[in-house]
């Protein structure tokens, strides 16, 4: 199972890194479960809302999501896991961004490998599998 980070979705939609879209197509064709967490959806919707072309951005996002990715809601267990991750990383002096903490918790709780271009940030999270499809 894979979990897509916001930057991966943006690159897939905009076709700026064709290797991401190609890998995504292969994983979808093979039936691999792929999730787009609630926090990623929030970040994408925010990007659409502040875009100079919000209608076009929103339509591109709708087309991308129409593939049928799992979109798990952020629940109480995700909140607990996020709090634990944030506290641990802060105690080590290695905090990551608050949204990244929430995304990491959703991926880790579901046993998903997080696909991101920001591996250095997410590799700090114990027990989280991370991949960069551009590497």
What are these regions (language model features)?
Residues 5-7, 44, 82, 107, ...:
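Generic structural signal for small/hydrophobic residues in well-ordered secondary structure
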Residues 5, 36-37, 96-97, 118-119:
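Histidine- and aromatic-rich ligand-binding microenvironments
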Residues 55, 70-115:
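Active-site neighborhoods of divalent-metal-dependent phosphate/nucleic-acid chemistry enzymes
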Residues 65-67, 126:
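Short, structured coil segments at secondary-structure junctions
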Residues 1-36, 49-64:
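Short, well-structured N-terminal submotif of metal-dependent ribonuclease cores
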Residues 1, 104, 108-135:
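Acidic, PIN/NYN-like endoribonuclease modules and their adjacent C-terminal/linker elements
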